[in-house]
Design a protein with these regions (language model features):
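Glycine-rich nucleotide phosphate-binding loop and flanking beta-alpha elements
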Residues: 17, 40, 239, 276-278
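Short amphipathic alpha-helical face segments that pack within enzyme cores
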Residues: 19, 127, 219, 277-280
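Core beta-strand elements of the Rossmann-like FAD/NAD(P) dinucleotide-binding domain
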Residues: 4-6, 260-268
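N-terminal glycine-rich phosphate/pyrophosphate-binding loop and immediately adjacent elements
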Residues: 1-113, 117, 122-126, 130-133, ...
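Conserved beta-strand-loop-beta-strand element in the redox core of flavoprotein oxidoreductases
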Residues: 242-262
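Conserved redox-cofactor binding core of oxidoreductases
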Residues: 73-74, 100, 112-237
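Conserved small/polar residues in nucleotide/adenosyl-binding loops
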Residues: 282-291
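Glycine-/small-residue-rich beta->alpha transition segments that form the dinucleotide
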Residues: 268, 272-277
Length: 292
C-alpha cells in the first residue's frame, strides 16, 4: 500500500524527534512520525505492583535483550565494552531514563583543542544555548541556579529535594575539598504544565506512573499531536529507506500495525532512532551506496 506524500517523515518518537516535531510543526507543514513501539500504559509501570523490583529488572529492563518486548529488537553486545540501554515506544529512552539532565559544557564542544582527543564540534555552546533554554522550559527542568563551574542559566523550576544518599555523597566531597553541585533534573518539583509535582513514588528508571518525570511522551508528544498537520503512527516498523537517483532519502518501506507492507514518501526524512537504530537504518536503503 502506498501512502500520500507528506512534507516531513520522522522515524522514531523519542526525545530528538519530539523536539524536532515541536519546532517544525510551527511551519504549517504535514508531519508524520512512525514509531515501532506503543504508547505506554502507566498502569503497567513497576511502581504499581508489590514485586516492582522483579518487573523492573525483567519487563522494564533497560536492555532489549532482557526485556524482549515484541516491539524490541535484539542487539549483539559481545564485542562491546558497554551495554545498550534503550526503549522502543512513544518517549523512547526517556521512558526508562532517570531524569538526569545536565547541559553539555562549553569545553565539551572543543575536546580536540583542549584535550587532544576526538574532534571539535563545528558549533559552540553559545550556538545551542537558546535551544537548551527552550528545551528546559518544554521539559520542565528543576535545578539549583548558581553553579560557578558552568555558564549561568535560568531554570523553570526549583531543585528536587536531595535524598539521604545525595547528602552523604555531598558530605564526602566537602571533606575532600571537591566542588560539587546538584544536577539539573527533568523531574518537576512543582505542579507544572498540567502535571503534578514529584512525590517520590518510585525509582525514576522504571517509568513514572505519576507523570512527574519528564519523559517526552508526556512533556512533548501530547502537545505535538494537538497541532495541525502532525500525525503519529505506532507499531510501525521501518524496513528500508528509499532514496532517489541522487542518494537522497525520499521515503520508507514499513510494516504497519497489521503487518501490511506500506510505502510512505516525503520531501524530508528524519531518522531519530537512538545511536543504534539510526545507524542501522542508514544501511537499509533501496540500493547500494558508498557511505561509510
Amino acid at each position: 500500500m502506498d501512502n500520500n506524500l507528506v512534507d516531513i517523515l520522522v522515524i522514531g518518537a523519542g526525545a530528538s524527534s519530539a523536539a524536532a516535531v515541536s519546532n517544525l510543526s510551527s511551519l504549517g507543514v504535514n508531519i508524520l512520525c512512525l514509531e515501532q513501539g506503543d504508547w505506554m500504559n502507566t498502569n503497567e509501570y513497576p511502581s504499581n505492583f508489590k514485586n516492582w523490583q522483579t518487573i523492573r529488572d525483567q519487563q522494564f529492563n533497560q536492555s532489549p535483550n532482557i526485556r524482549k518486548r515484541e516491539t524490541d529488537y535484539p542487539i549483539n553486545e559481545e564485542d562491546s565494552e558497554i551495554e545498550v540501554a534503550n526503549f522502543n515506544g512513544v518517549g523512547g529512552g526517556t521512558i526508562l531514563y532517570s531524569g538526569h539532565f545536565p547541559r553539555m559544557k562549553p569545553s565539551d564542544f572543543s575536546v580536540k583543542s583542549l584535550d587532544g582527543v576526538g574532534e571539535d564540534w563545528p558549533i559552540s555552546y553559545k550556538t545551542l544555548e537558546p535551544y537548551f533554554a527552550q528545551n528546559d522550559i518544554n521539559m520542565g527542568v528543576s535545578g539549583l541556579k548558581g553553579d560557578p563551574a558552568i555558564p549561568e542559566h535560568e531554570l523553570p523550576l526549583p531543585p528536587i529535594a536531595m535524598g539521604r544518599m545525595g547528602e552523604v555523597i555531598g558530605q564526602g566531597f566537602n571533606k575532600l575539598g571537591w566542588h560539587w553541585w546538584p544536577s539539573d533534573t527533568a523531574i518537576i518539583s512543582e505542579d507544572y504544565d498540567g502535571r503534578a509535582k514529584c512525590i517520590n513514588l518510585s525509582p525514576c528508571n522504571s517509568g513514572c506512573s505519576q507523570g512527574a518525570k519528564s519523559s517526552v511522551d508526556v512533556a512533548y508528544w501530547h502537545k505535538n499531536l494537538r497541532k495541525r498537520g502532525v500525525e503519529l503512527k505506532t507499531r510501525c516498523r521501518v524496513r528500508e529507506i528509499l532514496v532517489d537517483e541522487k542518494d537522497r532519502a525520499k521515503g520508507v518501506i514499513y510494516y504497519d500495525e497489521n503487518g501490511v507492507e506500506c510505502r510512505q514518501f516525503a520531501e524530508i526524512v528524519i531518522i531519530a532512532c537512538n545511536g543504534i537504530g539510526t545507524v542501522s537504518y542508514t544501511h537499509l536503503r533501496a540500493h547500494e551506496t558508498r557511505y561509510d
